């Protein structure tokens, strides 16, 4: 069965007994998938133009439904950064953990290379493209959060590397 819809419109009542769900939802409007393309109206950034609407009608409900779809020992991992739009940081990671705190197992950092930027970002003092500046930028390594959740709180994904718990930081 092929589906062509947003994640918030999936037939969630038919999705169950999932062992592992790994998702990297769009960072609100900072990642505009399929912009200008066919069916761009299905994208969450298009449907929900304000952060609160995106969070309340897409991001958190889909996260909850994904968790609900897990089997009793299933794991859900969510890779998301706090989006920054027009200078304002939206704490989507905190909102997710706050909502799913009873199921929170921990957080890991995913090491990634820098994402490409447009050539216009890398200009020298004369306004010309500066390849050396771009190459230096692209060699940087970043860490993105992966939040881990499960219905089974006896699971310990991090027992071999644990140095503290969430409670230690509260």
State each model region's role:
Residues 1-9:
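Conserved SAM-binding strand-loop segment of SAM-dependent methyltransferases
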Residues 9, 17-61, 84:
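Mobile active-site "lid"/loop adjacent to the S-adenosyl-L-methionine
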Residues 57-66, 99:
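Short, conserved SAM-binding segment of the class I
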Residues 70-76:
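Short glycine-dipeptide loop
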Residues 84-170:
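Class I S-adenosyl-L-methionine
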């Amino acid at each position: 069965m092929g589906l062509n819809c947003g994640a918030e419109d999936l037939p969630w009542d038919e999705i169950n007994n999932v062992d592992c769900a790994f998702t990297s939802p769009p960072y609100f409007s900072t990642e505009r998938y399929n912009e200008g393309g066919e069916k761009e109206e299905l994208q969450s950034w298009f449907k929900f133009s304000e952060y609160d609407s995106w969070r309340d009608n897409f991001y958190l409900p889909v996260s909850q439904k994904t968790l609900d779809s897990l089997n009793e020992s299933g794991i859900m991992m969510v890779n998301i950064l706090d989006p920054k739009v027009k200078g304002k940081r939206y704490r989507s990671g905190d909102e997710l953990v706050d909502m799913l705190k009873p199921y929170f197992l921990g957080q890991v950092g995913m090491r990634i290379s820098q994402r490409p930027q447009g050539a216009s970002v890398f200009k020298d003092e004369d306004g010309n493209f500066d390849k050396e500046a771009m190459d230096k930028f692209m060699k940087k390594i970043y860490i993105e959060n992966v939040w881990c959740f499960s219905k089974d709180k006896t699971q310990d994904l991090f027992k071999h590397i644990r140095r503290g718990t969430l409670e230690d930081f509260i």
